[in-house]
Amino acid sequence: MDVSYPPEAEAFRDRIREFVAEHLPPGWPGPGALPPHEREEFARHWRRALAGAGLVAVSWPTEYGGGGLSPMEQVVLAEEFARAGAPERAENDLLGIDLLGNTLIALGSEAQKRHFLPRILSGEHRWCQGFSEPEAGSDLASVRTRGVLDGDEWVINGHKIWTSAGTTANWIFLLARTDPSAAKHRGLSFLLVPMDQPGVVVRPIVNAAGHSSFSEVFLTDARTSAGNVVGRVGDGWSTAMTLLGFERGSHIATAAIDFERDLQRLCELARDRGLHTDPRVRDGLAWCYARVQIMRYRGYRDLTLALTGRPPGAEAAITKVIWSEYFRRYTDLAVEILGLEALGPRGPGNGGARLVPEAGTPNSPACWMDELLYARAATIYAGSSQIQRNVIGERLLGLPKEPRPEVLC
């Protein structure tokens, strides 16, 4: 396997390193070392700098405001930012650029691309995702939110839950049932809905770590243009699966770098507590190291698929299982190392839910407990590990489908 990058990608890497050196201060520890209000201010400054340098969406086509580069350059940029401990993008950007933006490029109409993509890049449109409902989580096709066509508008009524970035968004992409007479996976449509209207109410949800990273969204006679359907009316399931493929595979470019950085933090924790020679701890650290290497080579595999024009597809399920199960396991090990110290008086945590703590995050019990609690969600959101294993078994290995409960009765 040749894992070297071509000369043009390495030249782009040099450009990114120059940008990092110019915009991050000397001795930069990472945004995790900043108080929350300073972290947010610096992240906004970083976003403006990225936009000014044309680095917000380098692999999007130039006609829609992107850089027109290949996925390889996108990976190079992500690698260098991860190594430098650059601020993570806001959740709205991750949802708008990585997920919805790429889905619009793949499936959207020309009018949708020209209207929405520039506004996503500028930050004028801030997006959240409206998939899960109180009665439809892992069984996403059971959504009950209704969409009814009224002239040239869709009228939407329903209740979404576990909505990331809902409190900071002004648009939501969602699944709604537009044909209740159709089969469960049909009759769904993928709609783009403005949130700045009387029929949309957002209520934050406080999680176990005391942060409000999710929310509920209530839609009562909310309206959106009839043209704001991505894909075909009634074929929203297919559009949603395309988007979830981008979500499940979106972390692999930097997962090995991010988790390797945090593995070093875990090793430091073990040394500080005098447990780095304990056989059980060493076995856990070795397991973590092996999984980081698996993520690294899995990333090369996914990059190869992207460069040949293949969407993530069902293989994204493998990626999602690997990093989410690793996240849970290494935070378990951290709390084992801390012992009763992990249950002591709470100090400042890491400021919210993140896939991987930002560079510079303190090696404190409070931060590790925040990570432990959030790691539980990582094996559930974007499709639970059980669902991912079903996808791997049925769609990649060709195993028989799991029996449905009604068939067993």
Curated annotation (Swiss-Prot):
Give a yes or no for keyword Flavoprotein in this entry: yes
Q: Which GO terms describe its cellular component?
A: peptidoglycan-based cell wall
Q: Which cofactor does it need?
A: FAD
The GO terms this record gives for MF are: flavin adenine dinucleotide binding; oxidoreductase activity, acting on the CH-CH group of donors
A Pfam family this chain is assigned to = Acyl-CoA_dh_M
Keywords for this entry?
FAD, Flavoprotein, Oxidoreductase
Q: What induces it?
A: Repressed by Mce3R.
Entry's EC annotation = 1.3.99.-
Similarity comment: Belongs to the acyl-CoA dehydrogenase family.
This protein's name: Putative acyl-CoA dehydrogenase FadE17
